[in-house]
Amino acid sequence: MHWSGNWHKDSQASRSVLEQLYIEGVLLIHHKSGSRKFYDLAENHLSRELLERPNPCPDEESFMDWRIRRRIGAVGMLWNRRSDAWLGLGMTTQQREAAFSRLEKSGRITAVKVDDMRTPLYILNGDMPLLDTVRDGQTDAKPRTEFLAPLDPMLWDRKLVEALWGFRYSWEIYTPASKRRYGYYTMPVLYGDRLIGRIEPRADRKAGVLTVSNIWYEPDVRPAKKLSQKIESTVRRLARFNGCRYLQDVTPQDDQNIQNE
């Protein structure tokens, strides 16, 4: 067990050891309680056959290729350029470009041209059928209303988000209150295939209450009755997820439709 909130020197050493064993696969995180992580031996929860399988990435190049594919798959599409989506990979620009070249030549990723964008995006070949289905309008998926967590893979590359949707998002949790444009913990609002605004929900788990401090819609969005109902339904779903009751209604501001809906 280690407690993330304890920064004494003795706990830093134990934390480093536990995290290294976790990275090596010797330990896994069994559960968390607040800021405390409880570890256990991986062999107590995973089969011996799985633990003894050979490494699927026998060399550094194959490991880099796997990590690039994993990031592309998590976001859906990514470009081969400097991006926050590559944070933590420890790759140079040359290494990243070499990995993209190998993956494209081997048919594991495909370049996609997006209207009004000069830089191509790359998608996993296995996701191409889904892209074709959506592009051709053959999907039976229903439009959804969701609040995106600030660290959701869809938001990893905020320059890409702005290029695709014209939506500029900044996570202001570390921004001094006097300098925030919106709120402490705002979440982008996904409505169908559009990012239409930001919402700031606050959950008081001790009191079991979730409230909404504010909603900011994009300039071209008018909160129609249908939209307001979708927002309120999503807020109530978020409250249930957090084990809270919702005490503040999201009142429709007017009965207009979203422009260009």
Regions found by a protein language model. Give the residues of each.
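Long, low-complexity intrinsically disordered regions
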Residues: 1-146, 152-155, 160, 167-171, ...
